[in-house]
């Protein structure tokens, strides 16, 4: 799956911030392509063994920072042009 590379079990700080950081790094390195759809919050939570709230907070931070966007009834997508 798309988030198979994520490993946030070990580390310091809030889990949602570690998830956010790893997704951001994956986008910048090209592992996750621009325009690509992220797994639903429910799917990502199940895959990563995290709460839905944790995944939702990470996704919301991605949107606030301009890395992702939420499209109603479609899901979360990596922006075509990442804002800095």
Regions found by a protein language model. Give the residues of each.
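N-terminal basic, amphipathic alpha-helical segments
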Residues: 1-84
């Amino acid at each position: 799956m798309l988030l198979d590379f994520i490993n946030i079990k070990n580390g310091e700080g809030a889990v949602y911030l570690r998830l956010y950081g790893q997704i951001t790094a994956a986008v910048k390195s090209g592992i996750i392509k621009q325009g690509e759809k992220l797994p639903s919050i429910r799917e990502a939570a199940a895959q990563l063994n995290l709460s839905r709230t944790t995944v939702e907070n990470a996704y919301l931070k991605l949107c606030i920072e301009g890395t992702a966007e939420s499209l109603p009834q479609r899901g979360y997508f990596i922006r075509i042009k990442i804002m800095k």
